[in-house]
Amino acid sequence: MIKSIPIERILFLDIETVPQAGNWNEISGEEKNLWDKKTLRQRGEDVSAADFYQDRAGIMAEFGKIICISVGMLEKDNRLKIKSFYGDNEKKLLEDFGNIFNSPRLQNIILCAHNGKEFDFPWIARRMLINGFQPPVPFQTFGKKPWEISHLDTMELWKFGDWKSFISLELMAHIFGVPTPKDDIDGSMVAEIYYQEKDLQRIVEYCEKDVLTLANVFRKMRQEDLLTKSE
C-alpha cells in the first residue's frame, strides 16, 4: 500500500533534456553515423536521420543532455520545498545535484517520478557516468532485488499490472482534480525554447511546476490533501 510509505522520505523529481547540439550540422560525422545506425529501425526509411535527430535526440541519453533537474520534498508545514539544478554546463549541474545525497536526510531517500523508471532515473545515472561521476546510491540498481530498489513511479502505480497502459502526468492530474497551470509549453517544445529562444528560466519554471503536480498526483493516489509550493 502506497499510503504506508513515509512521504517525508520521498524525493519528487523531474528532468528536462535536449539534444546535445542545436541542429544536425553541429554534430560530428562519427556521431551522425552512430545515430543513423541506432535509430534506423525506429524511424524507418521514410524519415531522415537528420529530421529524427531534431525530434528524438533529446530523449536518448547517449545523444542528449540534461539542462534541468527539479526536486521536491515535504516540509513540516505540509508545503513542498522545491529546488532546481540547471544550466548549460551539464557536468556542473550533475555534480551539484549529486552532492545533495551527502545530506543525512537523503540517506534513505525514495525517488519518485512519472515514468521515472524508464526515463528520469536511468537518464540521470547514464549522464552521470558519461560525465565521469558514479551515480548516487539511490540510482544504482545493479545486484538489487526488485523490492530493494527505492523507486516510485506514478505511471507504474497507475498500471495495476496492465503493462500496455501509458498515461501522461497531465491526464493523471486531470482525472484526480489536481490543478495545473495553463502553460504555453510542453515537453516537446523544450529543445526549441532552449536552443532558439534561449529561455532556460522558462524551462526551469515548467520543470518545477511538474514536480508540484507529480507530488499532488501521488497525494491524491493516497487520498490526501493537495500540497502548495514553499516560497
Predicted regions and their residues:
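Conserved RNase H-like, two-metal-ion catalytic cores of nucleic-acid enzymes
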Residues: M1-N99, S103
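Metal-dependent phosphoesterase core characteristic of DEDDh/y 3'-5' exonuclease domains
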Residues: S4-E8, G64-D88, P104-E205, K209-E231
